[in-house]
């Protein structure tokens, strides 16, 4: 048997080992600032590669979307089941000025609402705000037992559900089309639209657990720096925003 060099064996590296480079040495951190609509404006931090040559770090940050729990923005665990999307529209030094980009429910909250013996009502509508943002708004509601009801189930007739759905769409169109995006955000936090739907549909069907479960941004107008700076307040350095008051007391809803 011929004795020779086994080519399959790995060769030894010549010279010294390469020095390990810290990947974070080429990156820089930026502070994310929420609009003054929310009570806590310091969302967190994000990083990006430093500006080099013709490549500007600010260009890579604009349009970046962050998903934040509303409980962190409002400082209250009552909003822990809702998630807010914030989009970076402008970079000022080390601060990223964001704007509202959408709203959603956590999946565990949605699953906890669906129960036996009741009817589910869902409605959605595409509507334009007063400042030309095109949104698709989704609402959800459930039937509940009437006072002194003996029957176990609370299923509703299809005709009644259609009436309720029509009323929900009317209210969502009215409440969204007459306000700006910032004013709409102030309505969504205390769930004003859900309470308005509950009040208006009492004559048709008694409802419970009425929520605007999702808001999706479809189209936005041409970027206006002045309106964004006004949304963040002068200088955009304040850590606290304006507290949104619901004007309502929590009502314990009747369960099935």
From Swiss-Prot:
Output the Gene Ontology terms for molecular function: structural constituent of ribosome
The highest taxon in the source lineage is: Eukaryota
Q: Which UniProt keywords apply?
A: Acetylation, Cytoplasm, Ribonucleoprotein, Ribosomal protein
Q: Name one GO cellular component term.
A: cytosolic small ribosomal subunit
Q: Does Ligase show up as a keyword for this record?
A: no
Q: Which family does it belong to?
A: Belongs to the eukaryotic ribosomal protein eS1 family.
GO BP, one annotated term: translation
Instruction: Give its localization.
Output: Cytoplasm
Q: Which residues carry this modification: N-acetylalanine?
A: 2
> Do you know which Pfam families this protein is assigned to?
Ribosomal_S3Ae
Instruction: Tell me what this protein is called.
Output: Small ribosomal subunit protein eS1A
The species is Clavispora lusitaniae (strain ATCC 42720) (Yeast)
Q: Where does this chain mainly localize?
A: cytoplasm
Task: Fill in the subunit field for this protein.
Answer: Component of the small ribosomal subunit. Mature ribosomes consist of a small (40S) and a large (60S) subunit. The 40S subunit contains about 33 different proteins and 1 molecule of RNA (18S). The 60S subunit contains about 49 different proteins and 3 molecules of RNA (25S, 5.8S and 5S).
Q: Which SMART domains match?
A: Ribosomal_S3Ae (SM01397)
Q: Which InterPro entries match?
A: Ribosomal_eS1, Ribosomal_eS1_CS, Ribosomal_eS1_euk
What lineage is this protein's organism placed in?
Eukaryota, Fungi, Dikarya, Ascomycota, Saccharomycotina
């Amino acid at each position: 048997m011929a004795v020779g060099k086994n080519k399959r064996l790995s060769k030894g590296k010549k010279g010294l080992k390469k020095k390990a480079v810290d990947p974070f040495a080429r990156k820089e951190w930026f502070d994310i600032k929420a609009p003054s609509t929310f009570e806590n404006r310091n969302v967190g931090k994000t990083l990006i590669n430093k500006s080099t040559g013709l490549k500007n770090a600010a260009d890579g940050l604009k349009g970046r979307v962050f998903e934040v729990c509303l409980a962190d923005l409002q400082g209250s665990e009552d909003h822990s089941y809702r998630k807010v999307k914030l989009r970076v529209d402008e970079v000022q030094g080390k601060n990223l000025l964001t704007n509202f980009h959408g709203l959603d429910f956590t999946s565990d909250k949605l699953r906890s609402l669906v129960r036996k013996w009741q009817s589910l009502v869902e409605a959605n509508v595409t509507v334009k705000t007063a400042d030309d943002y095109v949104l698709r708004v989704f609402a959800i509601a459930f039937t509940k037992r009437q006072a002194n009801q003996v029957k176990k189930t609370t299923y509703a007739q299809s005709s009644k559900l259609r009436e309720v759905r029509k009323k929900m769409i009317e209210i969502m169109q009215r409440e969204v089309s007459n306000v700006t995006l910032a004013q709409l955000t102030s309505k969504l936090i205390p769930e004003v639209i859900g309470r308005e739907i509950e009040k208006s549909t009492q004559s048709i069907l008694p409802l419970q657990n009425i929520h605007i479960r999702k808001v999706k941004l479809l189209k936005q107008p041409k970027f206006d720096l002045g309106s964004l700076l006004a949304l963040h307040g002068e200088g955009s350095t304040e850590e606290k925003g304006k507290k949104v008051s619901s004007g309502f007391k929590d009502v314990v809803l009747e369960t099935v």
